[in-house]
Amino acid sequence: GADGSGRSTQIKLLVDWLEAKGYATTQVGLKRSSLASEELERAKNGNILNRTTLSLFYATDFADQLENIIIPSLRAGFIVLADRYIYTLMARDLVRGLDDKWVHNLYSIALRPDAVFYLKLSPEKLIQRNFMKNHTLDYWESGMDLGLSKDMFDSFVQYQKLLSDKFDDMRKTFDFTIVDSDQSVDSLNQELRDHTKKIIN
């Protein structure tokens, strides 16, 4: 799900629940690699990255986590929870007009997860939540680099709709479970727990 969909809160609650049940967990996500995360953040702050360079930065960040965190954790018997995975990166790249085959080849090293939960929320609700949390909208999460609109609000709505459409397309190929995140934190977490129980039992 997008920023503001409740993703990070739900991951934390799932980790607490799984660990209370005796499962060892590891978390991964975007910009968490020791190799590339700081450089990626610095590069993004200038708002000057082209789409291919941005894609390669994120792919490097992912590949480093795959090699040094995800695979070793799975081998050790841990449950790995990803606060966004390659599907977010692929959707962003495809919306930015990168070649479909190139993008799929770039992420062909990724392991297929046991489950993908896509927390879906309307762009209008996402704007509200982002403003409540950060008091602003992010340049990249608003798709400002795409030239959709000079107005950041309008660009955000258009960009998030494009991403949502792309996720809907990808859902058929990658078997996403779409979860409506326009509900209370507790009720959303219970729904995710119910889905997770089917996998770990």
Protein language model features and the residues they cover:
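P-loop (Walker A) phosphate-binding loop of NTP-binding proteins
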Residues: G1-A2
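Conserved lysine of the Walker
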Residues: R7
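Hydrophobic positions on the alpha1 helix immediately C-terminal to the Walker A/P-loop
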Residues: Q10
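NTP-dependent small-molecule kinase module
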Residues: V15, F131-N201
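ATP-dependent small-molecule kinase phosphotransfer cores
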Residues: W17, K21-L111
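Hydrophobic residues at beta-strand termini and immediately following loops
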Residues: V28, L119, V179
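Conserved nucleotide-binding/hydrolysis micro-motifs of P-loop NTPases
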Residues: R32-S34, I86-Y87, L121-I127, V185
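A glycine- and Lys/Arg-enriched "phosphate-lid" helix/loop adjacent to the NTP-binding pocket
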Residues: L89-L162
